[in-house]
Amino acid sequence: MFGRRKAMPQATVDVATSPPLAPIAPVDLTSHEQVSAVLGVAAGIGQVLIAAGTTNFDAKNQVVAVTEAYGLFHCHVDLTYTRIRLFSYVADSRRNPVTVVRVMPAPVQDFLRLRRVDTLIRDILSGRASLVDAQARLNAIITAPPSLGLVGVVCSWMVLGGAVTLLLGGDVWAAAASTVASGLVIWLAAVLGRRGLPLFFQNVAGGFCAAVFASAVYHAGLVVGLLLRPSMVIATSIIALLAGLTLVQAIHNGVSFAPVTGNARFFDTMLITGGVVAGVAIGIEVSVLLHVPLPPMETIAAPNLASATIRVLGGAVASAAFARACYADWLSVGVSGLTALVGSSVFYFML
């Protein structure tokens, strides 16, 4: 009863912004190699955070916290959408400057890598990771292969596509068609990406395939007496292509003194979205030329208790599938699905 109370966990960014009591793992600040190593670890951590979608403000706080944890308090951090630069100097009589530059890789939503970096940051701030240990662990995190192969990623996106169709009010047949369409566009994007095709054209190709596939499935369903909603097939394919894009990051960067990165993220989002719209438009026109046009948009009835329950379950499965597609471990997948289940239940049953 009177035992020691367990400290509640804090978010990493809150830990990072807390003032350090003292250098936890100090290094020789008069050594150019030691200072460069500290800046290299901090820059690598910032590189992973930015690539995972962390805003510049939060990433800068964590980079500064890492350098201060090793006793390097005089460090300037310059972050943009494509580059991170750290400036400091050797604490000797000559004060020779030290600069470390890292070029940002293409944004990749790898939740497992982000979680490992989060653990590394906590270990550095708590003194459990020396500089040598941090270098080795960071290198292992950056060079580690994806925890999920292409087949697993495609299957996760297929599950997401089918679940989103149920979330939108579709039936089982529409969900099955959306599952196949999502897998097709994600597989096509992965193949084109490996060949070096820019993301804009990947999304054009994905949108084109989604529209043509939806038209083909709709007319094939008419032959066997099934009335499918091709609009749902196209919508779920678009969600699969654009699931990683958000305006929240752009706006957050814009209001947190990072206008360059905010504008870059905003333009990037608009350009890639335009690629999907162009691909879908081309696919619709090609379907008309092939005499298999798409029907007008259908209206969906208001949800009742049964359909609302299916939508809630669809939202939970879609959230869990997205987390798995982003390489999250199974515990995180379960938490993601449970969170979506609670949120969807509140929305459909209480509001």
Predicted features by range, described:
Residues 1-133:
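Soluble N-terminal domains of membrane-associated systems
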Residues 108-115, 119-351:
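Alpha-helical transmembrane segments and their membrane-interface boundaries
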